[in-house]
Amino acid sequence: MLTRRPLHSHIFALLLCLGLPLSAHGEIYKDYQPTEQQVVMTVIAVEPNYLDDYLTQLKRTWVRAMAVQKDLGFVVDYAVWTSDSANTPNVWLTITYENMAAMQPSKARYDQVNAEIEARYGDEEEALDAIAKGYEEIRKMVDHQIINRVEFID
């Protein structure tokens, strides 16, 4: 015959289960560690019906500039992310740097990137400026974060 346990025993069991993870104290560099690579993430809300236009224009501006920086070794990687299910925000831009030091601005690096962009795309400068100025009409910057991945230590 099955007997019914009092409600307080179920509540106690639930609290015990919920409390167990709280008793384990995690410690950085013992249980987990942040990676040295830093990711800059920009979150963008593109106006409805403009996503295709925005991505096409982004390819001609931001993606080109990031490709130059990657070719020159200033960034590890970059990416454009979208969501089919999100209404807003709906675009995420990421730039991966080797470490925090690689994110520091430098006049030499700035000049080198601009010279390479000019060499590759200088004849399109007016069109690219017009595209960049038009971004504000179709998108809103929602957030900007510097994040890093966590590695768990066995």
Regions found by a protein language model. Name each.
Residues V75-T96:
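Acidic helix-start/capping segments at beta-turn-to-alpha-helix junctions
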Residues L2-F12:
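Bacterial N-terminal signal peptides that target proteins for export
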Residues L22-G26:
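Sec/Tat signal peptide C-region and signal peptidase I cleavage site
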Residues E47, L51, L55, K59, ...:
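Solvent-exposed, acidic/flexible segments
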Residues H10-P21:
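Bacterial N-terminal signal peptides
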Residues Y29-Q33, V68-V76, T96-N148, F152:
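An amphipathic, aromatic/His-enriched active-site/gating alpha helix that lines ligand/cofactor pockets
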Residues E27-D53:
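Immediate post-signal-peptide N-terminus of mature secreted/exported proteins
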Residues Y50-V76:
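Short amphipathic alpha-helical segments
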